[in-house]
């Protein structure tokens, strides 16, 4: 294993240049193998988990979901505040910022982005909760691609460009995650669901985040500094892939749902009655044909 790791490190050095020594010896960042193994295990659980749960009752997970989402909300808020203050103290340049120009402020950014990398590992739990609750329709190509790729990308970011221009996307993403995980935490409490109206706008915020990241990254290409250009081109390409997938998700989830509701509403009027829609707006499906809802485990 050590020989393989040494060979891998030599290959990465030839491809990407020398690593940033400021993260040398840091947990999970010294070599790529643990991150790769975690990603493989994640993909195996995505594949095998639904098969294992097929003939089992779904778990509720309500209590642990509240704690989990609250924890990620607070972690995201901490990272956002620390990144903003670090950028302010280091007088970071919006258009392009190198990785060795702000002294101690760079180290502050690096320490926060280490937590950002760890948060991508923690967020694998999003998928595991979907599996345990048998919400398999939420395990989409977008969901798996985003979760699996972010952990791996940020291992490389932390080893080669752990500060400087790398801060912007992580700062925006941390802010979006404050909104997103607070929403998911509140939605875990049934009595709160009727008051949660902003899920649609979270997706819009995510799309705006990607567009702003492309704009800010492009500034580093147009007005270059000491930050490696190859990383900027890669980030632009990755953001484009996320925009394509999130736009498709948005259209499939909201535009088609709205068109379907308008069609059903018109049909109900033509039949001389209007159906109640509270079951849908409150995130519950109405019962039809006297079919009882399946029981959830209270684990």
Swiss-Prot record:
One of its GO terms (molecular function) is fatty acid elongase activity. Coiled coil: none annotated. Its main location: endoplasmic reticulum. Signal peptide: none annotated. GO terms for biological process: fatty acid elongation, monounsaturated fatty acid; fatty acid elongation, polyunsaturated fatty acid; fatty acid elongation, saturated fatty acid; long-chain fatty-acyl-CoA biosynthetic process; sphingolipid biosynthetic process; unsaturated fatty acid biosynthetic process; very long-chain fatty acid biosynthetic process. Its EC number is 2.3.1.199. The chain crosses the membrane at residues 26-46, 64-84, 112-132, 150-170, 205-225, 226-246. Residues 279-288 have a biased composition (Polar residues). InterPro entries: ELO_fam (IPR002076), ELOVL5 (IPR033677). One of its GO terms (cellular component) is neuronal cell body. Pathway: Lipid metabolism; polyunsaturated fatty acid biosynthesis. The modification N-acetylmethionine is found at residue 1. It is found in: Endoplasmic reticulum membrane; Cell projection, Dendrite. It is a multi-pass membrane protein. Residues 275-299 are annotated as: Disordered. Pfam families: ELO (PF01151). Belongs to the ELO family. ELOVL5 subfamily. Catalyzes the first and rate-limiting reaction of the four reactions that constitute the long-chain fatty acids elongation cycle. This endoplasmic reticulum-bound enzymatic process allows the addition of 2 carbons to the chain of long- and very long-chain fatty acids (VLCFAs) per cycle. Condensing enzyme that acts specifically toward polyunsaturated acyl-CoA with the higher activity toward C18:3(n-6) acyl-CoA. This is Very long chain fatty acid elongase 5. It comes from Macaca fascicularis.
